[in-house]
């Protein structure tokens, strides 16, 4: 018996009472219920169709379907960050309610494999499922499902062709919503089966108002000038602007967000650097030009960003139309070469040499 007790240790702690156990479990559940940080893009995504801004035509059609009218197959196209995905998700939530949303909606985007095999199997199998169930709140529920194909312009032509027959055969129980940036990349047989809606780029005023609302709710210190600059660097993409605003808030830690902070967050090349490149082109010294370009690359600035910002400078400059056309054509060539993986240093030198050549004609 003593040998057995040597291998054990006697606990002197009092046993856990029922109350203490309940308190411990309550504490752990309280920690679990603590709000998790959510990206502001998702937090402030429109929850209903009425919250969608600046897209009156598509909102009117979706409202009719919410009132009981049939929903056609849809094709949303337009620039990124204008609310295409948010609009159809908000409409689906209103149509089906939170309980049936996951059962009635299939969403596939560019991160999913969407070749011809997926269209034939996953999409087809989902479309063939029978529709059942009713909403717990008593509101009418439409007798169909919705398949959302985000960034449909990246689907192969074979996959798009395979989708045609599925859209026709399952028209009684399934509606399709294709979302893309470039409608020209969608084959004509698909576009003819859908009601097309172009999402207009959001106006600066609407973007500024939305960002000010978010800043107020999140207690962010930013001036009206800062909001205007944020809209400018995001280039009409509200999703990008909201992401920049959240990143800048985390960086400043409660202090006021300045234009310099936004410039750092957005990866924008400072205006004085762009002016320096233009001044080097005007100087006529190739050595000076090469040194400026080398400094920009060594500092980690993206060549594509320089191309975009240099384009704005050229357009606003008082050059002749012929000079602007030659420079912008070269900008397009360099942009294509960079997209194909060409050397950044050589492409920027070539671009700036063309700018220098055209500026020298003013002398």
Curated annotation (Swiss-Prot):
Keyword vocabulary terms for this entry: Acetylation, ATP-binding, Deafness, DNA replication, Nucleotide-binding, Nucleus
User: SUPFAM superfamilies, from UniProt?
Assistant: P-loop containing nucleoside triphosphate hydrolases (SSF52540), post-AAA+ oligomerization domain-like (SSF48019)
Pfam families given in the database record: AAA, RCF1-5-like_lid, Rep_fac_C
Which InterPro entries is this protein grouped with?
AAA+_ATPase, ATPase_AAA_core, DNA_pol3_clamp-load_cplx_C, DNA_Rep/Repair_Clamp_Loader, P-loop_NTPase, Rep_factorC_C, RFC_lid
UniProt keyword Nucleus present: yes
**In which domain of life is the source organism classified?**
Eukaryota
**Membrane-spanning segments:** none
Asked if Nucleus is a keyword of the record, the answer is yes
Location relative to the cell: Nucleus
> From the UniProt record, which GO molecular function terms apply?
ATP binding; ATP hydrolysis activity; DNA binding; enzyme binding
Instruction: Indicate which residues the UniProt annotation says bind ATP.
Output: 78-85
Indicate where the modification N-acetylmethionine is found in the sequence.
Answer: 1
Q: Which disorder is it associated with?
A: Morimoto-Ryu-Malicdan neuromuscular syndrome: An autosomal recessive neuromuscular disorder characterized by delayed gross motor development, gait disturbances, incoordination, muscle weakness, hearing impairment, and decreased body weight. Some patients are wheelchair bound and death in infancy or childhood may occur.
| Remarks, miscellaneous | Despite of the presence of a putative ATP-binding motif, this protein does not bind ATP.
What is annotated about its quaternary structure and interactions? Subunit of the RFC complex, an heteropentameric complex consisting of a large subunit RFC1 and four small subunits RFC2, RFC3, RFC4 and RFC5; the RFC complex interacts with PCNA. Forms an heterotetrameric complex with RFC2, RFC3 and RFC5; this complex has ATPase activity but is not stimulated by PCNA. The heterotetramer of subunits RFC2, RFC3, RFC4 and RFC5 interacts with RAD17. Interacts with ATAD5. Interacts with CTF18. Interacts with CNTD1; this interaction facilitates crossover formation.
Q: What does this protein do?
A: Subunit of the replication factor C (RFC) complex which acts during elongation of primed DNA templates by DNA polymerases delta and epsilon, and is necessary for ATP-dependent loading of proliferating cell nuclear antigen (PCNA) onto primed DNA. The RFC4 subunit probably functions as a scaffold on which the other complex components can assemble.
Full protein name: Replication factor C subunit 4
| Species the sequence originates in | Homo sapiens (Human)
């Amino acid at each position: 018996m003593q040998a057995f007790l040597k291998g054990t240790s006697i606990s002197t702690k009092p046993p856990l009472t029922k109350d203490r156990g309940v308190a411990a479990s309550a504490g752990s559940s309280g920690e679990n219920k603590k709000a998790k940080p959510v990206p502001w893009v998702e937090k402030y995504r429109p929850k209903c169709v009425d919250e969608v801004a600046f897209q009156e035509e598509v909102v009117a059609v979706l409202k009719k379907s919410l009132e009981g009218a049939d929903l056609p197959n849809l094709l949303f196209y337009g620039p990124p960050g204008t609310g295409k995905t948010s609009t159809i998700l908000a409409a689906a939530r209103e149509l089906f309610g939170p309980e049936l949303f996951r059962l009635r909606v299939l969403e596939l985007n560019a991160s999913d494999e969407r070749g011809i095999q997926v269209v034939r199997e996953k999409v087809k199998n989902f479309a063939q499922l029978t529709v059942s169930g009713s909403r717990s709140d008593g509101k009418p529920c439409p007798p169909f499902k919705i398949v959302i194909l985000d960034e449909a312009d990246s689907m192969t032509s074979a996959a798009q062709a395979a989708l045609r027959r599925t859209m026709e055969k399952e028209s009684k129980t399934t509606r399709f919503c294709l979302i893309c940036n470039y409608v020209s990349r969608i084959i004509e047989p698909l576009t003819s089966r859908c009601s097309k809606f172009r999402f207009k780029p959001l106006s600066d005023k609407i973007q500024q108002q939305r960002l000010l609302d978010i800043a107020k709710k999140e207690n962010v210190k930013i001036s009206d000038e800062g909001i205007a600059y944020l809209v400018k660097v995001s280039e009409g993409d509200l999703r990008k602007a909201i992401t920049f605003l959240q990143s800048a808030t985390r960086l400043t830690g409660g202090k006021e967000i300045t234009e310099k902070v936004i410039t750092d967050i957005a990866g924008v090349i400072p205006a004085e650097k762009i002016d320096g490149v233009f001044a080097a082109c005007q100087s006529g010294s190739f050595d000076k030009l090469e040194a400026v370009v080398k400094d920009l690359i060594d500092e980690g600035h993206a060549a594509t960003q320089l191309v975009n910002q240099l384009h704005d400078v050229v357009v606003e400059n008082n050059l002749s139309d012929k000079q602007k056309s030659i420079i912008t054509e070269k900008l397009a060539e360099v942009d294509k070469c960079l997209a194909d993986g060409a050397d950044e240093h050589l492409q920027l030198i070539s671009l700036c040499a063309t700018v220098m050549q055209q500026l020298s004609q003013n002398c």
